[in-house]
Regions:
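Residue-level marker for buried hydrophobic side chains located in beta-strands
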Residues: 38-40, 82, 111
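Metal-dependent catalytic neighborhoods of phosphoester/phosphodiester hydrolases
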Residues: 91-101
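Short glycine-/acidic-enriched loop or helix-start segments at secondary-structure transitions
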Residues: 49-50, 92-94, 123
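Short, glycine/acidic-enriched loop or turn micro-motifs at the edges of active sites
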Residues: 44, 88, 117
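Metallo-beta-lactamase
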Residues: 59-73, 77-89, 105-130
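Conserved beta-strand hairpin/beta-sheet module of binuclear metal-dependent hydrolase folds
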Residues: 1-66, 70
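A general structural signal for short secondary-structure junctions and capping/turn motifs
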Residues: 21, 102-104
Length: 130
């Protein structure tokens, strides 16, 4: 998580557990206008397999879908989803698994991302593929 920063430095503010894991939060933003319901980032999601989640604790009972419901809306009410960037913890919640199929969670939404980041994500250089 902290790259080349030594653990003795980052663990002062982010203590790790016995598995060297730290608490982190992903926050999304829901914006209601007169004719739009815009979601900024969709979070991690839950379509990943057990091996994936062995590296990430999912704590707390909320999901992006539950949070939208608590605000009085349904996933189908979302008109636009804007991704700040295309890392899995920001866009993973936009897709759900139905059996072997992956389908959009927000079926009525247009999806938006910065052009430069889209190009980076869809045409990675050799270092970015690693």
């Amino acid at each position: 998580m902290f790259g080349v920063v030594p653990k003795v430095i980052w663990e002062k503010t982010n203590p790790a557990d016995d598995l060297n894991m730290i608490d982190m939060a992903a926050r999304s933003l829901l914006i209601e206008t007169t004719n739009k319901l815009i979601l900024i980032d969709a979070g991690l999601g839950d379509k990943q397999n057990e091996k994936f989640f062995s590296h990430y604790y999912k704590w707390g009972g909320d999901s992006i879908e539950n949070s939208i419901k608590k605000a009085g809306f349904k996933s189908s009410d979302i008109t636009d989803v804007f991704f700040t960037h295309l890392h899995f913890d920001h866009c993973g919640g936009a897709i759900i698994r139905r059996g072997e199929r992956l389908i959009p969670r927000f079926e009525n939404a247009d999806f938006w991302v910065n052009k430069d980041h889209w190009e980076w994500a869809t045409s990675p250089k050799s270092r970015g593929r690693a």
